[in-house]
Structure formats: C-alpha cells, structure tokens
Amino acid sequence: MSRRLSLPAGAPVTVAVSPVRSPGGDAVVRRGSGLTSPVPRHSLGSSTATLQVSPVRRSGGSRYLGASRDGGADESAEFVHYTVHIPPTPDRATASVASEAEAAAEAEEVHRPQRSYISGTIFTGGLNCATRGHVLNFSGEGGATAASRAAASGNMSCKMRGCDMPAFLNGGRPPCDCGFMICKECYAECAAGNCPGCKEAFSAGSDTDESDSVTDDDDDEAVSSSEERDQLPLTSMARKFSVVHSMKVPGAAANGNGKPAEFDHARWLFETKGTYGYGNALWPKDGHAHSGAGFVAADEPPNFGARCRRPLTRKTSVSQAILSPYRLLIAIRLVALGFFLAWRIRHPNPEAVWLWAMSVACEVWFAFSWLLDSLPKLCPVHRAADLAVLAERFESPTARNPKGRSDLPGIDVFVTSADPEKEPPLVTANTILSILAADYPVEKLACYLSDDGGALLSFEALAETASFARTWVPFCRKHGVEPRCPEAYFGQKRDFLKNKVRVDFVRERRKVKREYDEFKVRVNSLPEAIRRRSDAYNAGEELRARRRQQEEAAAAAAAGNGELGAAAVETAAVKATWMSDGSHWPGTWTCPAADHARGDHAGIIQAMLAPPTSEPVMGGEAAECGGLIDTTGVDVRLPMLVYVSREKRPGYDHNKKAGAMNALVRTSAIMSNGPFILNLDCDHYVHNSSALREGMCFMLDRGGDRVCFVQFPQRFEGVDPSDRYANHNLVFFDVSMRAMDGLQGPMYVGTGCVFRRTALYGFSPPRATEHHGWLGRRKIKLFLTKKKSMGKKTDRAEDDTEMMLPPIEDDDGGADIEASAMLPKRFGGSATFVASIPVAEYQGRLLQDTPGCHHGRPAGALAVPREPLDAATVAEAIGVISCFYEEKTEWGRRIGWIYGSVTEDVVTGYRMHNRGWRSVYCVTPRRDAFRGTAPINLTDRLHQVLRWATGSVEIFFSRNNALFASPRMKLLQRVAYFNAGMYPFTSVFLLAYCLLPAVSLFSGKFIVQRLSATFLAFLLVITLTLCLLALLEIKWSGITLHEWWRNEQFWVIGGTSAHPAAVLQGLLKVIAGVDISFTLTSKPGNGGGDGGVGGEGNDDEAFAELYEVRWSYLMVPPVTIMMVNAVAIAVAAARTLYSEFPQWSKLLGGAFFSFWVLCHLYPFAKGLLGRRGRVPTIVFVWSGLISMIISLLWVYINPPAGARERIGGGGFSFP
C-alpha cells in the first residue's frame, strides 16, 4: 500500500537524471513522482544526448520512492541530482503546515544549547568512598534530551529524508545517544555505518532485541566494514571524485562478486586535463588556460608531492656580521679577565691584605659566573613557522580524507588554579574563554581547569564561563577579533573598527560588550550569592534538626529520661557550603569540616561542556536560534571543558602544583587523550589565536618526533611603563632562551609550553644521540634496547635507565609483552590509562611522507570522530585522581612533573633533555602567543624571585645537578643548566663586593695599593668589552638598551635581597631538613576594568600596587648597603677635605664603586619612597642633616693623622 509523503510547501525535490537513449533511437522522457530517482549516466561529455527519467521502483521497505543505489544495469555508473522546487498546492496545504512546524522544531533542536548526561553530572569519589555521579538540576539551560522533547511533543516519526514511519525506541530511548529518531528499517540500513543525526557510530548497546534487526554475523561484518572505513582505500572513493567512466575497469560491475569496480591507478597517474577534468579535488587550480586540450609544451606535469616536501618551519642563524664579532668579543674579554686576575693575584696590597683577598675572591667568582652565562649564548638562532603549509598538509581534501576534515592531532589545555582569593575567578575565566576561542579544530581541543583548592566559587565561576562562551566564541569566529580574551579585547586602546567590513559588527560588538559586563557582575557577585545561599540552607537545616531533637527530647521526657531530653536540644554547629541545586558541595567548605577542608576533600570531575561532534554545526539568525548575535554560517560548537579537583587526604603528600599537573595528565588521558598538552597559568591568556597551530608546526615537521616541548616566551601586561623591577625579563626570554634554542633547546619555564604527552610519560626519544668531543659536537647514534635489571637498583639508576614506547605492533607483527607488562607498575593500576599510552604515541607521530620519518602514521588517520564520553569513562577518571593512586609508581620521579623542588618546571625540562629529547623556542612574529600578569609590587616581586632562587639551590644540591647529566645532553646545554642551579650563590660574593667600597672609604684603604695605569687599563678593557657585548646582544635579540639596563639593576637588587635568603633556606633544607613553604603570588583582578588586563584607568589607579610599600625582611640587606655606602661617601669626602695630605685617588676609586652600587639599587630606593609626591620635604631635610652629623662625628672620632694634635689641643671647631 502506497503512502503520500508529507512534504512542506515549497520543499525542494531531488531528481536524479541521466542521458539515455531508447532502443529505437528516439528520446523518451519518463517521469516519476518520487523524492529521488537515480538513473545511470554513461557519458557527461555527450552534448547531444537527451534526458530520460527512469521508472519509479520501490525499495524493500516500500518507503523510498526511487531506485536503490546498488541497483541498475551498471554499478559503475554515476548520477546527477537536480533540485526542483515544487510550489505549494491546495491539496498539500495541511501537510505543509505540519511539516513547517516539524522543520521549525528541528531547527530549534539544532540551535538550542543542550547539556548531555555527562555535562550535567558532577562525579565525585576517592579514598574510602564510592565513585558516584550527582545529576545537577539546570532548570533554565535546556537540560532535557532530544528524545524527551520529541516524546513530549508527540513527534515520534522517522527523521530520515523521505520517510515518515514511526520511530522505534530501544529500551525507551532512541538507538543513538544524540536522540535522532529513526525507524526500524532505516536503522537496519544504517546500523553498519554512522548515525544520520550526529554522524558518529551507533552506540554499542543500541541494537534491538529482535532477531531480524542485526545478527551476530552482521556485527562481524560491521566490524570489518568499520576497519576498512578507517583504512580509507582509494577504491572506496571511486564514486566521489570527478573521474570519467573510461577510468573504470570494463565489466567490473558484472563480475558477480558484488565488489565495486576497481580503479585503474596506472591510467590515473598519467591522465591529462582533457580526460581527467580540470579543477577537481586532486588537480591544482593554478594551471594555465588549456583546460580542455591536455598538456601542452608550456605546461609541466603537476608535482603532487611538492607540498609534502615543503617544510613547516624554518631555522635561521643570526647574521655572521653580528655573531662573529660577538664571539670574538667573548674571547677577548675572557683573555682580558684572565690577565687581570693574574695581575691582581701577583700584586697584593700589603696595607690591607684582608681587603685585597676579599676583592680577589669576589672577582674570580664573578669571572667564573660570567663565563657560565656567556658560553651558552654562542649559537643563537631564529625560528619561523608556516601556517599555510600546515593547513595545506593537514586540512585539505585528499584521497584518504575527501571531506577535508582536520588531520591535526588533539591538544589538551591545562589551566591551574589553587586559591580563588589570590587568583580571582574572573582572571581565570578570561583565560579559559581565550582558550575556547582559539583557532584550532574544535573537536581536537579540550580544556581542563585544575582547582587545587576545591572551592565552590571556582566551580560556579566556570559554569558561568561556559554559559558566556556560547556567545563569545561564535562572535570571535565570525568577526576574527584579536585578542580573544574579552577583558583584553574590550580594554585595548586602539581603533576596533580597523579592517572590519561587516555592517553588523558594531551592533553585535555592543551587544557582546554589554553581555560581558553582565557576566563580570555575575561572577563578582558569586561569593556573596554562595554565602547567602549557604546561610539560608544551613538555617533551614538547623530548624529541622532542632525540631527533630525537640520531638526526641519530648519523647524522652515522656519516657522519664530527662537527661537525654536535655542533651538532645543541642543543635549541630556544622556550617556546610551548598550548591545551587540544594545539595552539599563535595569540595572545600567555607567553614572547614571533616572531608570538606582544603587538604581533606573528595575528588571532583564535572564536564561543563561535552565533547563536540566531528561535523560542523552552523548557527542561524538570533531570533531563530535564541542567541544574542546572528551566527549564520558560523560554527557554534565549543571545545570540551572539564572541571577537575583532585582528592586530598591527611597523610598523603599532594606535591603542590606538580601533583595537580600529574592528576590532569591522567584525567585527560582517559577523557580526551590528546597527544599534545598545553600548560597555562590561570593568569596567562591566549593572545594569538593561531599560537597552537604555530606550536604544532614544530611538533609535526621533519625531526619533530624528537621534540619534547615547544616553549613560548612569557609576555606580561599591567607592568609600569618604566618596568622598574624588570618584570618583562626580556634579557632572559629574548637573549638566553634564543641562544639555548641553538643548542638542545630552551628550558621549561612553567607556563606557555606545548608538551608531547609521551615525553611527559618518561619515554626516550625515537632516535637517541650521545654527544661527545669538543663542545659536544660529535654525535653517536644509539640503538636502545631494554636492559634486564639484575638485583636492586637505586633511584638514580632507575631514572637513568631507558624506557622505550610499547609499540602498538612491532615490525614482526608481535607486541612487546615485557614492556607492556611493566607499564602498570610504572603508571598505576588503571587499565584504561595504560591502554591510552600507545594510542597517544601513534596520534603524535609524523606523517609517513615526511622526509626522514621511518615510523609515521598515514595521512587522514586522525580525521575520524572522537569516541563519545560516557559515565564509565568519567568514573575511571575519578579513580586516577585519588590521593593513593601514585603509591608505588614512578609518578613524580620519572613520569610527569617531577617532585621535590619548588621549581618543578626546570627539573621536568631537565629530565627530558637528559634523556636525549630536544625542545624548541617559538617566538610568534606578529602577535605575542600568550600574555599574563606580573607582580609590580616590590615585595611580591622579591618573593617571586626568592621562590625561583630557592628552587635553583634545591636543584644544585640534588641529583638533578647538571654535573651529573648523561652523555645525551650537549656540553653547552649542561653549562646552561649548571648556571641555572648555581646563580643564587653569586649573591654571597655580590653582598661582600657591594660592601667593599664602603669599607674602603671608611678605612681609607683600597683594593689595590695604588691606582696604576695597568689597573685602569684592565678596567677599561673589561668595561668596554662588556658594553660592546651588550650592544651586540641588543642587536640580534631585538631588545632595547633600557630593558638591558633594567635587567642589570634588578640583578643587583635580587642578588642582595632574595638570593642570599634562598641560599640560606636551601642550606637549611639540605642540612637540617627544614621544609620550605611559599604562598601564592596574588594576581591583580580585572573586574573593574581599570587595572588588570587591558585596563583603561589612569596611571595612578592602574599602578596603585607599584607605589604600595609592604615591609619584608628581604629589604634589610639592600637598605643596609645603601645607607652604608651613602654614609661612607660622606665620611670619606669630609676626611679628605680636612686632611693635610688628602689622597684623592683613593677617594675617587672608592666613591666610584659606591656610586656604581647605588645606581644599581636606585629602583629599589625609589620603590621604598612610595608614590611620587607623597614623601614630605622634611624627610629629605632631616636625612641630609643626619648624614652631615654622622660624617662630622666620624671625623671627630677618627680624625686625619696631621690634625690630631690640633684637634686634641684646642678641641673640635669648625674651620
């Protein structure tokens, strides 16, 4: 029995037409009233052929009015589909109204933001508590599934095109998790493929119970077909490219084996434009105008492999006109220092031997420290990435990837936060918004926020961020705004209309700006909202508890037990923190309690944004999709966003930030398993949306399989224009790091770094190399094999052993059973995590056609949908963040971030370089990759430097000292790491050397017996070479002289304040075992829009912290040095003026060095004065008077030798 299809008014009807002649030679046209009528066409080149429509045939289910695709006389034939718009007629009016309503419902279903079961459930678990999921009640966010909405509206018909049969439910739900309604017959045809709704494979449990739906044999066939589909052979694409009929093997369709026609590869390789076609998927579009005549003399055969040989990156050395003089000056200054120190040792000062000895010891150490700092700077390089080649190689249609899906590997972004009070949630929200809007394939990006404090404020701020991201991310993609951090974008002082051509940009920018302002208000009001909500719920709980206790007391009194009744009146004093759905927050409470304290709470995982689909989801007009802006033609998908708070319990060491990072590594491996990891601090946002692509260029280029991480320079905002405390640190990031890039690679500095996941797992590089000979230039290739352990090894031996990647399949076809068996012992007991390791290694490989790559992956292997995220996966992730998971494993010792130091970043990078890995320094040319905030207050800056220096002292006294590095580390790379661990000890000699001028002025002695011409000549040569080296460094690094001088000043400030304290703390930890604890550096908030990121306020408000004086014990040594030198200059000047035999040379020598010390400490003194104009003038007057009094008293106490008798006889009198 036939049925009339319900088509909407004016709906297009697709008709397949092919030119076929009748047997009699006349053209006969036949029409069919169906949706599709595919008819074979034998030639597209025939212009005389007439059009014929085949008779309509029904399929087996009598649902489609048209021929089956597999039917027909010739299977190799292809079809042309024409779209015909049928106008509405009176007999179709009723169906049109119904179908229009159905179409509107479908459109609303597409554009409505949905929350899956995973994104609407918070998972908790940990020690002595079961893993459970708590479904959150989101009333206003569209939490109902598509199936429930369809059931509520009564729309239970099949959604397949041309079918209106009733849909079937498997266990009360559709066969696919996306909620796409499909009937039984359509499902039987699609069961072996993908769901027509979400374009992903059907769930494993979606098969029906009927025996005629999908049998076991069909399952085996489905598995084999999916494997064949993953391989994507060229023959399967025969129908999807514009290849003419002559390219098919004749008679292949009638061979009776049911297989499609084979593709003639030999003929295809030598086809011309005339027979193959011009402008198709494989032919370059930049050819000549001879599109129909084949190759001519002027045309060259296209080189289809040219793009594979184009490099993704370029490395250029510094110009020899700059580098050669730079190296020569280093050699000249080294020789001059050697002769100078030899002369100083041979010419002591007999009048002040102790002064001479101290000065010589300091000068020898300074020369040694300068040599360690200069040697790694001999080979600076510059690198550049080509994003066009990256897009062409990994995102263009190919035979294995006809749809042009992205073949780029996945990236998991880690954002760490520990205390929302010192790290404002709005700062973290801006960082996450910039990550979600990054220019990278949405389905390949995942963002994880680690809240090490387990605060509800961070959780709800992240939920607000996910809600605002649905407006902000499409706005960024539509208009291509930069930067994609809303606070920085709306706060920048420039013309935001530059290069904008869309007429709706101004209107939509105004809407988004207002929405962002409301978003900031909501985030800023969260602490008060949480407090009021918790107080209300706690008050209700207390009332219910009191009522229940009064009832029990009354019952006890009636029973005659008065004491029990009086005791029952006491109410519970526990003050819980409540979530918005009326349940207890499983993390840290505002009033700490058992299992809810900062160091004692369960593990929490919540997917705020579920993983996106593999196919783009285009938006629509604001009125249709319910959004704020028009997103027509804009992909509105969002990357996966996950909240993670690891479990903490008393008695288990949580290892600070390194432990949190390792917990994120394990969680992400189970939930998304991106082969690359980007680490960002909560105050470092993505300033260049293409930064991730630039990092991938270095990872995926030739030799990229040996790159463990790509480090980006740190750039800062909110720093005062004069950069008083050298917060930009450009000498380190633009000079030292560029120079190390020419060796084995830069250090890891804690943020803005893209890691290779397998390198973090402690595996060795694919091709290890030992460096020997002069400067480590002679290389020896190693063939690494697994060494069997005999007996007990020390921890150091275990760290130095090789750990090669367990291959998915060896060349001989067998797996490395021994290596696979060792993985659970190294990585823990999670089988899911262990199984993800070889998958991540395979996805991080280079392409097979990359030059020099022997074990690459085929192109298009990653252009497949991601596996859906289910509750079992999240429950497994809860297990790997438990407090006891790392026990008896190698986490923190060899795997992941290394424990035992407050500078875990430097140690982690050192371990990778020590195994033979390389790193790359990526400086983006046009825009900074990432930007963050820096502490502009003097006290905060000194405490930051103290933490870094203390970590260096710990490294120096540990087995991570570069003196014990393996032969796989280059010699100059060892020198750089050794200098990183030794530089705090220079502060001991710097303190003494800064006091030597004052001691010399007070005592009237000098470090040399007399200022000879030889001594002055040595000083002149050493000073001139230092200045010339600085100028050349400025030339090849691009920094300014002002920035170089600020760095020199703060080197003295830090060396006389924070570094000595770091040496003392490090010695106490090594000798006495005193543990070192640090507090977080407070991040400036940006909630008001005046300070912080991109603030628009005036200088006084933006840099208020710069002028705030907070006293610290670290300020005592620099203040003492300044006062002593100032008083010494005054005393020496007064003594020389009143002396009968003045020694001006000693005064000038001592005063010159004291002035040198005071010039370097000038920013420190300026910071102590606070805001300009706030210090009263009387302070300067009294300071001058006190200095004069001290000077005169010193002259009276210790007068010159010629004036003692006169002063003693006549008393003290002014001249």
Curated annotation (Swiss-Prot):
For region Disordered, the annotated ranges are: 24-46, 206-231
Q: Where the protein is mainly located, per its record?
A: Golgi
Entries under PANTHER family matching the protein: X-BOX TRANSCRIPTION FACTOR-RELATED
State what protein this is by name. Cellulose synthase-like protein D4
Membrane topology per the entry is: Multi-pass membrane protein
Transmembrane region positions? Answer: 321-341, 352-372, 988-1008, 1014-1034, 1060-1080, 1114-1134, 1147-1167, 1177-1197
Its GO biological process terms? cell wall organization; cellulose biosynthetic process; plant-type cell wall organization or biogenesis; plant-type primary cell wall biogenesis
The highest taxon in the source lineage is Eukaryota
Which intervals carry biased composition (Acidic residues)? 207-222
Q: Which GO terms describe its molecular function?
A: cellulose synthase (UDP-forming) activity
Which Pfam family, any one of them, does this sequence belong to? Answer: Cellulose_synt
What residues sit in the active site? D452, D905
Q: Which gene encodes it?
A: CSLD4
Family per similarity comment: Belongs to the glycosyltransferase 2 family. Plant cellulose synthase-like D subfamily.
Where does this protein reside within or beyond the cell? Golgi apparatus membrane
- What Enzyme Commission number does this protein have? 2.4.1.-
Which GO cellular component term is one of those annotated?
Golgi apparatus
Q: Which InterPro entries match?
A: Cellulose_synth, Nucleotide-diphossugar_trans
* EC class of the enzyme, as a word: transferase
Q: What does this protein do?
A: Thought to be a Golgi-localized beta-glycan synthase that polymerize the backbones of noncellulosic polysaccharides (hemicelluloses) of plant cell wall.
Supply the alphabetized keyword list. Cell wall biogenesis/degradation, Glycosyltransferase, Golgi apparatus, Membrane, Transferase, Transmembrane, Transmembrane helix
